[in-house]
Amino acid sequence: MAKLQLDMDLECDFKLYGIGTHIGGHRLAWELNRLFSWELVYDRELESFCIKTGELISKHIVYSYRKIEEEIDVSLVLNRVPEGCLTVGQGPNSLDYLLKVNLGNIELDGVIQTIRTSKLVTLVTFLDAEKSGVLEAMFELE
């Protein structure tokens, strides 16, 4: 008997940015709120599990802002914790925070430039969600 295999491609409807900074999450959330007029607040802890054993590896703090009627969904996630990182690869692992941004129909062109105006941020870059290894974790935030 023939077996069928379901092959689904997950499509990102969001942009993912990596941020390097020396400040804590609550302070960075406040700064992003100031820059973009968002209202990021503490949401929950995102748990990261080992793929092979299913054991809990690390917990990552999440700050979120959602406006359903305008299709705005923003999440700031602590990437680096003592137990490990959500991202994979030497470059993304040096990033302190991940910023997942879906602004519906609003253009995202100026996000990096706006964040770079902050004196509290040392680095901001665009990340490929699939290559950085966090695609599944970002979908858990929805």
Predicted stretch roles:
Residues 6-25:
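Terminal, regulation- and interaction-focused segments at domain boundaries
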Residues 15-21, 95-104:
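Short cationic amphipathic helices and targeting signals
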Residues 2-10, 83-93:
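Short, flexible, solvent-exposed loop/turn segments with mixed acidic/basic and small polar residues
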Residues 37-48:
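Short, well-structured beta-strand/strand-turn elements
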Residues 97-142:
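Glycine-rich, aromatic-bearing surface loops/beta-hairpins
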Residues 47-84:
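Surface-exposed, low-hydrophobicity interaction/linker segments
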Residues 23-39:
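Amphipathic alpha-helical segments
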Residues 23-25, 69, 105-107:
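Residues that cap or initiate secondary-structure elements
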